[in-house]
């Protein structure tokens, strides 16, 4: 397939998906689209590429990078923020990585990141949260945190179905709710903004399916459904019920509930079973601190997932090192959690760890777990040796402050040493 402004490498092969099984077929020299991103993306993007190339080479593979464009780079080439070229290239090549994007005022949508996820139907936002030795943390035992959050990406109050106070539309909704749905007196008089919170069986089950499959493939002992169903019974309560239903329908032979764990197995989990349990969202935020090691894979809705993953990230050193990815049906778009920080753009000083570890998550999605392990080990060795960027150096006694590019070079050096 040809594109308007995108050059497809001659020396790589496409990742494909088996239509019957849904499994990826990944060559040893895949073409992977990359969006460097806005602001500090121009620094962390190339730094991550360098590290990912080294890990691929060390495990007998190579990556053929294909530059695609969104944000400021797309405006330069296409005079628009998110060209169809980019969406098509990612969809056709299945696996991609992007840096942070800034959504300009008047862009036509609230968020470039959200728009890209919606166009590709990337329904699961996946956030691994684990501590790297040497990274300062505000908690006493940060290494207890080793959790992966699956956050539903397309529904909930983030669906964007809302109406501004003072508009004709919001008045119609208010009247309908009060007069037709029997909620008279619930909404206070005066200006009001109203939003709708859709939670569907379809959206819930495909997210929980992804979370359980991840747990099974990665030897994770439990999946926890996080919800506020004690209050929002027909939305978040339905999420809980549909989650358990999916586990029983599709994974009944390899999952057990928490009740079954205690009633049938006296609290001892069989090695071939994943425990599916649920927690109320506010209690779960406490348990992240008080019972950290009890949780492995989290499956939750959009808003809860936003809170949960950021709170968990704080326990292991902050969002500057937090990786992420978005999964769809045979699609993966990896991205760091942090923003574009335009005031540091081009200064070669920011921490590229989140982008590097997002690439690690992408490699694992592709089945390159050996390369992924090498990246984590090399990053951890680099940081524990005190070779860090300015944000960590000021928190580490005796740290050696490195530029973005120098830090990437040091990680590459450690990859070669560890391989």
Swiss-Prot record:
Mg(2+) binds at residue 306. Its EC number is 1.1.1.42. It holds the Pfam family Iso_dh. Its cofactor is Mg(2+); Mn(2+). The keyword Phosphoprotein does not apply. It catalyses: D-threo-isocitrate + NADP(+) = 2-oxoglutarate + CO2 + NADPH. The keyword Transmembrane does not apply. One of its GO terms (biological process) is glyoxylate cycle. NADP(+) binds at residues 102, 338-344, 351, 390, 394. The record marks 158, 228 as: Critical for catalysis. InterPro entries: IsoCit/isopropylmalate_DH_CS, Isocitrate_DH_NADP_dimer_prok, IsoPropMal-DH-like_dom. One of its GO terms (molecular function) is isocitrate dehydrogenase (NADP+) activity. D-threo-isocitrate binds at residues 111, 113, 117, 127, 151. Binds 1 Mg(2+) or Mn(2+) ion per subunit. Keywords: Glyoxylate bypass, Magnesium, Manganese, Metal-binding, NADP, Oxidoreductase, Tricarboxylic acid cycle. Catalyzes the oxidative decarboxylation of isocitrate to 2-oxoglutarate and carbon dioxide with the concomitant reduction of NADP(+). Belongs to the isocitrate and isopropylmalate dehydrogenases family. Homodimer. This is Isocitrate dehydrogenase [NADP]. It comes from Haloferax volcanii (strain ATCC 29605 / DSM 3757 / JCM 8879 / NBRC 14742 / NCIMB 2012 / VKM B-1768 / DS2). The gene is icd.
């Amino acid at each position: 397939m040809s594109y308007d402004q995108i050059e497809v490498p001659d020396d790589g092969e496409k990742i494909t998906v088996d239509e019957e099984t849904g499994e990826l077929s990944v060559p040893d020299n895949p073409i992977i689209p990359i969006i460097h991103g806005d602001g500090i993306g121009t620094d962390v993007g190339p730094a991550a590429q360098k590290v990912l190339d080294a890990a691929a080479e060390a495990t007998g593979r190579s990556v053929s990078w294909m530059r695609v464009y969104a944000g400021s780079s797309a405006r330069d080439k296409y005079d628009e923020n998110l060209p169809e070229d980019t969406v098509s290239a990612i969809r056709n090549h299945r696996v991609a990585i992007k840096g942070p994007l800034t959504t300009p005022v008047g862009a036509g949508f609230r968020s470039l990141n959200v728009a890209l996820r919606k166009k590709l139907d990337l329904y699961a936002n996946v956030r691994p949260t684990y501590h790297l030795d040497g990274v300062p943390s505000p908690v006493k035992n940060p290494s207890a945190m080793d959790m992966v959050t699956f956050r539903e990406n397309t529904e909930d109050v983030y669906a964007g179905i809302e109406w501004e106070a003072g508009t004709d539309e919001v008045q119609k909704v208010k009247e309908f709710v009060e007069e037709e749905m029997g909620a008279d007196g619930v909404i206070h008089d005066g200006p009001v903004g109203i939003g709708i919170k859709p939670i569907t069986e379809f959206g819930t089950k495909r997210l929980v399916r992804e979370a359980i499959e991840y747990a099974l493939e990665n030897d994770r002992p439990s999946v926890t459904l996080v919800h506020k169903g004690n209050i929002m019974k027909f939305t978040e309560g339905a999420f809980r019920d549909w989650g358990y239903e999916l586990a029983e329908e599709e994974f009944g032979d390899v999952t057990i509930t928490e009740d079954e764990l205690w009633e049938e197995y006296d609290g001892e989990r069989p090695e071939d079973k994943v425990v599916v349990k649920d927690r109320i969202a506010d209690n779960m935020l406490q348990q992240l601190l008080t019972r950290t090691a009890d949780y492995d894979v989290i499956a939750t809705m959009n808003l809860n997932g936003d809170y949960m993953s950021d709170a968990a990230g704080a326990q292991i050193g902050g969002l500057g090192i937090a990786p992420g990815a978005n999964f769809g049906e045979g699609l993966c778009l990896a991205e760091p959690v942090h923003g574009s920080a335009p005031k540091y753009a081009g200064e070669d000083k920011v921490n590229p760890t989140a982008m590097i570890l997002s690439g690690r998550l992408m490699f694992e999605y592709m089945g390159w777990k050996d390369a992924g392990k090498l990246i984590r080990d090399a990053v951890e060795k680099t940081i524990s040796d005190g070779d860090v960027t300015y944000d960590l150096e000021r928190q580490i006694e005796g740290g050696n402050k490195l530029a973005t590019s120098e830090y990437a070079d040091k990680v590459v050096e450690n990859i070669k040493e560890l391989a």
